[in-house]
Swiss-Prot record:
Keyword annotations: ATP synthesis, Cell membrane, Hydrogen ion transport, Ion transport, Membrane, Transport
Quaternary structure and interacting proteins, as annotated: Has multiple subunits with at least A(3), B(3), C, D, E, F, H, I and proteolipid K(x).
Keyword Ion transport: yes
Source organism, top-level taxon: Archaea
Residue span of region Disordered: 37-57
Gene Ontology molecular function, alphabetical: ATP binding; proton-transporting ATP synthase activity, rotational mechanism; proton-transporting ATPase activity, rotational mechanism
Assigned protein family: Belongs to the V-ATPase E subunit family.
Subcellular location: Cell membrane
Matches recorded under PANTHER family: ATPASE H+-TRANSPORTING V1 SUBUNIT E1A-RELATED
Biological processes per GO annotation: proton motive force-driven plasma membrane ATP synthesis
Function per UniProt: Component of the A-type ATP synthase that produces ATP from ADP in the presence of a proton gradient across the membrane.
GO cellular component: plasma membrane; proton-transporting two-sector ATPase complex, catalytic domain
Protein name per the record: A-type ATP synthase subunit E
Length: 208
């Protein structure tokens, strides 16, 4: 190979080497950039995952705490309800015992319940129903009650005993034709006032 040819070949090889070096250099720079970007992306993703994980963990924690509080509240309300129901059951038993005796206070209350029911009906010809053991407590009062209630209501009033009823105590009054009735038994009164009484009983039982 001539000297001129060698120079050309060497020049081509040198130029090719420079291009190769440049390509390699550029490639290495690109790889470094890719690696750097990948690391940043990976770090961001890692932080995102950790952040999401923390959020999910916090949410789960709050959910568990909320459920625990709700269950505790439910259990507390359930326990209070049991205590209140037990208090009502005890009160009912006490009333039953009082109404089954010759207790003067109950006899007075029974007459009062008949008066209230008569006034609610507006007087008139009414049938009075009480339990069998209470018949003797009221039959001697009906004539005077009729006169007193006629004055109160402004309507001619006659109270007569009807068939005995099955009740703890109290009375049921109704018109002669049975169209209108006022249930003033102890059971009915307890049911009517239970909502109000429940609140008062709860305040007394759980005031602390």
């Amino acid at each position: 190979m001539s000297s001129g040819t060698n120079k050309i070949v060497e020049s081509i090889k040198s130029e090719a080497q420079e291009k190769a070096d440049k390509i390699i250099q550029d490639a290495q720079a690109e790889i470094a950039t890719i690696n750097s970007d990948a690391e940043k992306t990976a770090e961001a993703e890692k932080n995102k995952i950790l952040d999401n994980g923390k959020k999910q963990s916090d949410m789960k924690y709050q959910q568990i705490i909320s459920e625990a509080k709700m269950n505790a509240r439910r259990a507390e309300l359930g326990a209070k309800e049991e205590v209140i129901e037990a208090a009502f059951a005890k009160a009912t038993e006490d009333l039953k015992a009082k109404a089954s005796s010759d207790d003067a206070e109950y006899s007075e209350s029974l007459i009062k319940m008949i008066e209230e029911a008569t006034e609610e009906l507006g007087g008139g010809d009414l049938i009075v129903q009480v339990k069998e053991s209470d018949v003797a407590k009221v039959e001697g009062h009906l004539k005077k009650l009729s006169a007193d209630l006629a004055t109160k209501t402004g309507v001619s009033t006659t109270l007569v005993l009807g068939e005995p009823i099955d009740a703890i105590g109290g009375a049921i009054l109704k018109t002669r034709n049975g169209d209108i009735e006022v249930n003033n038994t102890i059971e009915s009164r307890l049911d009517r006032f239970k909502g109000l009484l429940r609140s008062e009983v709860a305040n007394v039982l759980f005031k602390n």
